[in-house]
């Protein structure tokens, strides 16, 4: 029997290959952790429905490949995203340095008002840390976006990160609706029973 969802939010996970984007996604969507995931090929997505302020919000979360050869494919998914999480690995300096490049990709391909958040993942491996929390916080401050350190393995801040991003998107949408502003490309999608989309797992494999 079809359920009614009040809103559908499209979220995107981006960042270098190997930073743990897929693990973060599976921790949030399945409350599970698997250290043997292979690198994402193309695009995957998962769906989870949450409740915020008495509204049921269906989150469609897209996990993108970090490898350069998939960049053209993955940037096509930026448009229409309402929230983007930029993920780096706190034990990998290069993945942190590349966050600025990922932000440039967002500026080139995503809607101007997309909500963004930076995640410093693998917080559980503190003994191998190369990027301090303070540097992550400063980078986020430079761009005026939120920051959290997470661990998909130890289940630290993953739930909090997704709920915070969803709450920010909803607040922005509510403000637009209250102001009766013209509908933009990133307006929330209200869902009725006949418009339910499949919540099955999808993988786009490039041969």
Swiss-Prot record:
CDD domains: Rab8_Rab10_Rab13_like. Phosphorylation of Thr-72 in the switch II region by LRRK2 prevents the association of RAB regulatory proteins, including CHM, CHML and RAB GDP dissociation inhibitors GDI1 and GDI2. Phosphorylation by LRRK2 is required for localization to stressed lysosomes. It catalyses: GTP + H2O = GDP + phosphate + H(+). Pfam families: Ras. The modification Cysteine methyl ester is found at residue 204. Its cofactor is Mg(2+). This is Ras-related protein Rab-8A. It comes from Pongo abelii (Sumatran orangutan). The gene is RAB8A.
